[in-house]
């Protein structure tokens, strides 16, 4: 079993899945693939693969994430807007610990009550503050 850090889950699985959902939602709003590709900073071929379920299929995003993306697409006017919206969505995934759900899926053997990512960081910050 390969060790995967939560950040790797984000980079390899979550960011592509979130981009894919942005592409789907933007297409539903009537945007053309060329425009979607420009906004997301990917190729038109990547958008085609997202829309045809040939890319970013390893993760099915939770309904709450899809809902957030739907709302986000209405605010997006430029690539920098997409970056900001994706960062907010990733932060939400971390804050709500949905990242743990995805981490468990791709790395077997993690205890159900694992808190390493959150507990270690919190205890480390507290130790640093005490110095």
Label every PLM stretch briefly.
Residues 15-30:
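Short, amphipathic alpha-helical "recognition" segments used to contact nucleic acids or chromatin
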Residues 24, 48, 70-74:
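Amphipathic alpha-helical segments within well-ordered protein domains
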Residues 1-19:
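Short, Lys/Arg-enriched anionic-surface-contact patches
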Residues 32-39, 47:
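Short alpha-helical "recognition helix" segments of helix-turn-helix
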Residues 57-74:
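Short Lys/Arg-enriched helix C-cap and helix-to-coil transition segments
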Residues 51-52:
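DNA major-groove recognition helix of helix-turn-helix
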Residues 71-131:
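Helix-turn-helix/homeodomain-like alpha-helical modules used for DNA recognition
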């Amino acid at each position: 079993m390969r060790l995967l850090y939560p950040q790797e889950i984000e980079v390899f699985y979550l960011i592509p899945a979130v981009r894919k959902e942005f592409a789907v939602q933007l297409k539903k709003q009537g945007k053309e693939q060329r425009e979607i590709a420009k906004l997301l900073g990917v190729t038109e071929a990547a958008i085609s693969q997202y829309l045809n379920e040939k890319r970013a299929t390893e993760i099915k995003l939770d309904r709450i994430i899809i809902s957030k993306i739907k709302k986000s697409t209405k605010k997006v006017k430029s690539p920098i807007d997409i970056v900001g919206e994706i960062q907010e969505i990733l932060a939400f995934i971390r804050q709500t610990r949905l990242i743990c759900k995805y981490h468990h899926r791709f790395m077997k053997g993690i205890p159900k009550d694992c808190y390493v990512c959150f507990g270690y960081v919190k205890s480390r910050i507290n130790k640093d503050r005490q110095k």
